[in-house]
Amino acid sequence: MQRHEFSFELDAPPELVWEVFWYRGPDRPQPKDVKTRIEILHPGDAIGNGLVRHCYFPVPKWLGSKGVGQSWEWLTEVKPYESWRYDAVGKPLWSHATGRTRLEPIANERTRVTFIEEYEAFNPIMRVLFEKRVHESLSRDNDTILAALNGGLAWHRRRKDKATRAVPGTSDAPSS
């Protein structure tokens, strides 16, 4: 079994960071890289418990999947603005993963984001031969994740500013 944990801090309160992960409006930007995307198969309840998603992500090409991995994930233990858990079945290498994401408020309207994941290939031979290499490959893109979250925060700030300007009486412009 492999375990990966990492954290970083973002210049935004947990409520805004939460939106980057959970906002599902039709205007939500989609990644330009077709190897990375998430399809919501079932939205879960009002706060997201029971959400089921199908994820696509880059994997080493030597796995024989043309460089694209897939996972089917079920989210539980959702605590809005705080944390959630996921259980996943993924391929190639047919595996199970359990992960948690935690948002912790820190000083100056900032948030510490912590990801923890445990990953295990089902097949004991594949586990010995490939599990560690595959997990290391998937876990080394922390900078990419941080850049995506910062981009998501910028997009949500622009979206909120635009919505505020669209509501009469909320603009800073002089009224006539």
Which sequence ranges carry the predicted segments?
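Short, surface-exposed coil-to-beta transition loops
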Residues: 3-5, 66-72, 95-100
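A short, structured loop/turn motif at beta-sheet edges
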Residues: 11-15, 43-48, 76-83, 102-114
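Glycine-rich portal/gate segments that line the openings of hydrophobic small-molecule binding cavities
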Residues: 29, 39-92, 125, 144-175
